[in-house]
């Protein structure tokens, strides 16, 4: 039987996208809460099938839902950079984008690898 390789990713945005667009009513924010609730179900499904994945997670989500994000890592999955609060970089100045990258990286406790991004080198992160 042929072997297939698949890259499975999730955008674990929770309510960050709503906040980035200024949608901070209880209704908008409640829609963003489902991602954190669903993460437990997704992790159980992935574990039952022995599947590993990458979760693109904004820093806001890591700070707001640390337990859920820790569960992702403990289950053997990767958390990847996904900005601070899902603000499109095209709408940011260079300085705003740099500040967003730095702010998004800190909650994870990670540092960006040398040479990976010019912004990281300039900022010393």
What is each PLM-predicted segment?
Residues 1-118, 122-125:
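Catalytic alpha-helical scaffold of carbohydrate-active enzymes acting on polysaccharides/glycoconjugates
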């Amino acid at each position: 039987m042929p072997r297939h390789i698949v890259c499975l990713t999730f955008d674990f945005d929770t309510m960050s996208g709503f906040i980035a667009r200024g949608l901070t009513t209880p209704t908008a924010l409640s829609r963003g809460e489902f991602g954190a609730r669903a993460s437990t179900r997704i992790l159980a499904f992935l574990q039952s099938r022995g599947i590993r994945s990458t979760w693109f997670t904004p820093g806001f989500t890591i700070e707001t839902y640390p337990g859920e994000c820790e569960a992702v890592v403990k289950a053997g999955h990767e958390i990847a950079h996904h900005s601070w609060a899902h603000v499109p970089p095209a709408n940011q100045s260079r300085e705003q984008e740099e500040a967003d990258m730095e702010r998004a990286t800190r909650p994870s406790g990670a540092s960006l690898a040398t040479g990976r991004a010019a912004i990281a080198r300039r900022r010393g992160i």
